[in-house]
């Protein structure tokens, strides 16, 4: 297998990034399907992928060396940047999935044979252009719409993506830990690689937030019975407006059975064939992955706010009027199949509600059949909180 190298005159950098998944079309760049009105009428103006936003900021900073363009940016124009290449993320998150820390690498052309970009200048410059690009685009849309703000701009896009840190990537070639995935005849990976955000990641940690509440859900008035805006999911947001798009809200009269969930989680920990928990369209040839740990914790809703924790825990932990709690499911593993984490959480939530017994989880796992497992948890409750690269910290 050939070695993967970056071109002469380019230097590889490793970045960490955080983002609000609600405001983005997932991580991966989607070309002409971003910042547009789709064929079915969906208004995606000013809506981009995380990668699309970063590429546009790179285009303004690196290709133009900071020169501001006269016309508003469009992400589908920034794929041809001649001064950066080989953009690779460690974890390609879906639309509405948040990240407290994801990592990626790219190769940036050196200013001359001896002068490369300083990491801190890249961080400051990219964040500057991420904000300015969003402002310019919003202003252009407002001008075109004569001041009428489209629904997708109700949430400001200026603060949805931020570069956290940047470092020059290690120079040495590394063994590719995915080289032995699958039979030799189907191997498409090189045996050794330059530092790569995806293939050198040693662990990924996700946290899923579930809001379990017992508040009565108001019913739509008769006059609004035919109003499609009164959907059950919207009515369930009643009483918890700050959790909209931040957690999976489940209305349940009884507390989740954490002991049963933990018992089920123990059966999922370790190295297994997770075919029953892989998403449709998963391209990975080998469904075997390793889960290092699954931690489950419940916290009264008000106690999830740190400044209220001590007082609320003392006065209200056993109070029957405490109508909600946050359940967090933390899953750490070396790699995951497409939508594996959300499928695992959906199964654990079923167990917590008593709809599936802990002992049945092992049978679901051994069945290697996605149809045997419960429904997948929604995307907006999922957070990628950390990606580790061995001894190399970003």
Task: Please report, for each region that a protein language model flagged, where it lies by residue.
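Structured-RNA-binding interfaces characteristic of tRNA pseudouridine synthases
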Residues: 2-316, 321-394
